[in-house]
Amino acid sequence: MQVLLIAFAAVAGLLNTIQTGTNATLNKSLGAPVWAAAAVGTATFLTTLFAALTVMLFAGQRPSAEAVANVPWWAWTGGVLGAVYVLATMLVADKVGAAIFMGVTITVAIVVSLTMDHFGVLGFEVHKAGLARIVGGLLMIAGLGLIAKF
């Protein structure tokens, strides 16, 4: 099961990189980042709605009113955070290139993730940042420096 989860995460990473290029091209083609972001947001909403309705219809899964009421306030901010990322792909990626853009976003994500794991914030279990994890984060930063320089 763990292998399938890791494979799915790898596919998500691949698609995330491709999405950066498609978003930047959509923005360039339309010449209006807010409209391009709205198009991406609409597609995201419709895809998610279709998936949710399919799961509800075939698996009978839906949250209870109590579950919805007990969600921490910050857990609802994912859509806003995603919108900021989409805008960044449209405004920055084609100007700095795919490798720099993805390198920065992935490296920052790794460093922040190490911190979040270490302290167990936002619902993550605690995974202490030992020496090997810290060195791994530093190597990510060094790798980004090499990509940016060459």
Predicted stretch roles:
Residues 39, 104-105, 135:
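Hydrophobic core positions of alpha-helical segments in small-molecule transporters
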Residues 36, 92, 119-121:
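Hydrophobic/aromatic residues within transmembrane alpha-helices
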Residues 29-33, 88-104:
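Structural motif at transmembrane-helix junctions in multi-pass transporters
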Residues 1-18, 22-29, 45-74, 96, ...:
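Membrane-interface interhelical linkers
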Residues 18, 84, 111-115:
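Residue positions within transmembrane alpha-helices of multi-pass solute transporters
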Residues 33-41:
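Membrane-interface alpha-helices at helix entry/exit sites of multi-pass transporters
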Residues 43-47, 104-119:
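Alpha-helical transmembrane segments of compact multi-pass small-molecule transporters, enriched
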Residues 14, 46, 80, 96, ...:
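Hydrophobic/aromatic residues within the transmembrane alpha-helices of Major Facilitator Superfamily
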